[in-house]
Design a protein with these regions (language model features):
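Gly/Pro-rich hinge or "lid" segments in bacterial periplasmic/extracellular proteins
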Residues: 1-36, 40, 169, 173, ...
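Short, well-ordered beta-strand elements
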Residues: 9-12, 22-23, 39-45, 63, ...
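Structural transition elements
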Residues: 11, 135-177, 195-200
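Extracellular/periplasmic solute-recognition and catalytic clefts
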Residues: 14-25, 42-103, 114, 122, ...
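Ligand-binding "clamshell"
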Residues: 73-87, 232-235, 248-263, 319-325
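Periplasmic-binding protein-like
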Residues: 86, 102, 106-148, 168, ...
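Long beta-strand-rich cores associated with HINT superfamily self-processing modules
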Residues: 316-345
Length: 345
């Protein structure tokens, strides 16, 4: 399946050259009559984002990979090619912190609370996205997110109070009760995948932890080893990215936070929480279901279950002759069928 995939989509697999390209061709047996419009697609694999921008500006490709561009790169591309059509949209991918709650020192709930109180979410957003990210909980934030907690309500949760200095002062008081202080810091390793979307926020996280007597040492992990390391829970603190398949509480909550779930990488397990997730899943009234989901988000935050740093927005650019492409706002995994795309040239 990795080298000769078979499917029923608008395009059929032709060729895969590792680290070079992927080619697909129009599927004449596609179930939707008259689609796709394109005869095929050649995907060029470009590892370096800056090189990818130059490739686009030079006209060697028709569009960037969907959601390929972070905000600074998007601005760079537009400055070099003002005619490019670009959209920056929510990706339903959040940056989050995982703490190994099954091993010292973060088997202590008070220490997990300290880490939560250390966070300055606005600093992450302003530094890494030029202010274009979104503060939220586990669910995609509004307005694009249907189920996310309103910002004013978020501010009442632990660590979300905009008064970061107050939050950190409270965290230092907890640390002092635990025997730490200015002359005795807690040393931990902060593990993350060794690519910029992971590594850059991990560096900022280390700065934030330092404000509450926790000295973090960055441990960059090769991509091939990252997921196995996470699955083994071979970390103390980890900076991770979580992408959701759609904006729906069942998908997000069951997959990432219930006991034993495949995506529950930090091992959070609370049977009462699982019952809360079941209750919202059975509620037909959307308004009532939202209230149940918001109670769940509060519970996750109070339990410091994978604290969310921010929800990212990612960019896609295409040349004006590319028609029919619509970026999705509920997940980076949707809107990739390309069946409605055509070239006006």
């Amino acid at each position: 399946m990795r080298t000769h995939p078979i499917g029923t989509g608008p395009f059929k697999f032709v060729e895969f050259k590792p680290n070079e390209s992927i080619k697909v061709t129009r599927n004449p047996d596609y179930w939707k009559q008259g689609r796709p419009y394109l005869d095929g697609i050649d995907y060029t694999i470009v590892k370096n984002p800056s090189t990818g921008i130059l490739t686009f500006v030079a006209g060697k490709v028709d569009m960037t990979s969907p959601y390929f561009l972070q905000v600074p790169l998007l601005k760079d591309l537009k400055s070099q090619d003002p005619d490019a059509i670009c959209e920056l949209v929510p990706s339903n991918v959040n940056r989050n912190v995982m703490m190994n709650r099954d091993a010292p020192p973060f088997d202590n709930a008070e220490l997990r609370r300290v880490a939560t109180l250390s966070l300055d979410r606005r600093a992450f957003i302003d530094t890494l996205t030029l202010g274009k990210g979104d503060i939220g909980g586990a669910m995609l934030p509004p307005p694009e997110g249907v189920w996310g907690m309103p910002l004013e309500m978020l501010k009442t949760l632990p660590g979300y109070d905009p008064d970061v200095q107050k939050n950190r002062a409270d965290a230092r008081k907890i640390m002092e009760k635990l025997g730490y202080g200015q002359n005795k810091h807690l040393a931990v390793k902060v593990s993350t995948r060794n690519i910029p979307p992971y590594r850059d926020p991990a560096v900022i996280l280390i700065d934030h932890l330092k404000e509450v007597y926790i000295d973090g040492e960055l441990e960059p992990i090769d991509t091939a080893q990252w997921l196995p390391k996470v699955m083994r829970k071979d970390y103390t603190v980890a900076l991770n990215l979580t992408g959701n398949g759609l904006d729906d509480p069942d998908q997000t909550l069951y997959e990432n936070f219930t006991c034993g779930a495949e995506g529950n990488y930090d091992g959070y397990c609370n049977p009462e929480f699982d019952k809360m997730v079941d209750r919202q899943s059975m509620e037909f009234d959307q308004t009532k279901r939202k209230e149940l989901v918001w109670a769940i988000e509060r519970k996750l935050t109070e339990d410091a279950a994978r604290p969310i740093l921010w929800h990212n927005r990612s960019g896609t650019c295409w040349h004006p002759y590319v028609k029919g492409y619509t970026p999705m706002v509920n997940s980076i995994y949707n809107g990739l069928r390309m069946e409605d795309v055509w070239l006006d040239r």
